[in-house]
């Protein structure tokens, strides 16, 4: 298996989602212009052809919406990536986790290129998490994490950082360690889509810096979960612009939307294909 890759695709296979998270950057949650199963496989072929032309190997994140809302198509696509896309070296699934059944876990265990499953958590307690994702979601997500870990999957957790949960990050890291989560990352809240009505959740520059300085410090101490630092903020935390990496949008990464529109980045809505 190829260990390192030259390129990255974030592939949104659907806008449909079973949640309506209050910070979500999506606005539309319907199937309008969603690609068919056959078209998804054609896109996979186009990706493989492009990577071969560039002489690149790629990783991919398969997401939505919620990808498990079309799980039959998802599993067909993953099997196709396994058997027909040599240049896509490995992939992750980004999900809220709550639609994954025992049968799905058995299916997922057959995919050799599946590197990790990323689920979302917004806080270390039912109150802090469910306030964003809906009543009862915290219990469903923690149960999903436990089940995935018990079956040998590498699990990462992504948290959207807001004024509401920024002081809860230390407790969340502790909880994730107890759950055996392998990786943890923070994403800054951007008041777009559903989140546009909650613009007051946005952190100030000073608050952002303080949290990421804390994450940088903790990354040297906390082993479980491994803290994935937001690369473009290294310079923010160190005042050294030579540390870290520049944004990869359009350089070593692309986003594919459910209707096959190509963007440099999901947060940069400028169609380039």
Language model features: what each stretch is:
Residues 12, 30-35, 115, 120-122, ...:
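Radical SAM enzyme [4Fe-4S]-AdoMet core and its adjacent flexible, acidic
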């Amino acid at each position: 298996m190829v260990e390192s890759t030259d390129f990255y695709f974030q592939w949104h296979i659907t806008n449909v989602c079973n949640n309506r998270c209050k910070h979500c950057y999506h606005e539309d949650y319907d199937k309008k212009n969603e690609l068919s199963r056959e078209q998804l496989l054609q896109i996979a072929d186009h990706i493989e052809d492009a990577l071969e032309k560039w002489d690149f190997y790629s990783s991919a994140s398969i997401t939505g919406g919620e990808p498990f809302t079309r799980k039959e198509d998802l599993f067909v696509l993953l099997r196709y990536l396994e058997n027909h896309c040599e240049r896509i070296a490995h992939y992750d699934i980004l999900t809220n986790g709550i639609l994954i059944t025992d049968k799905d876990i058995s299916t997922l265990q057959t995919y050799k290129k599946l590197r990790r499953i990323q689920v979302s958590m917004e806080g270390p307690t039912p109150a802090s998490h469910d306030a964003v994702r809906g009543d009862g979601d915290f219990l469903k997500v923690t149960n999903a994490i436990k089940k995935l870990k018990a079956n040998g999957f590498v699990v990462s957790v992504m948290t959207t950082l807001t004024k509401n949960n920024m002081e809860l990050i230390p407790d969340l890291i502790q909880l994730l360690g107890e759950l055996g989560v392998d990786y943890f990352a923070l994403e800054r809240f951007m008041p777009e889509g559903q989140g546009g009505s909650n613009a007051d959740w946005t952190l100030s520059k000073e608050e952002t810096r303080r949290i990421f300085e804390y994450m940088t410090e903790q990354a040297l101490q906390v082993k479980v979960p491994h803290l994935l630092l937001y690369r473009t903020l290294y310079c923010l935390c160190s005042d050294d612009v030579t540390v870290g990496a520049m944004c990869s949008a359009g350089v070593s990464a692309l986003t594919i939307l459910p209707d096959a529109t190509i963007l440099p980045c999901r947060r940069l809505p400028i169609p380039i294909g």
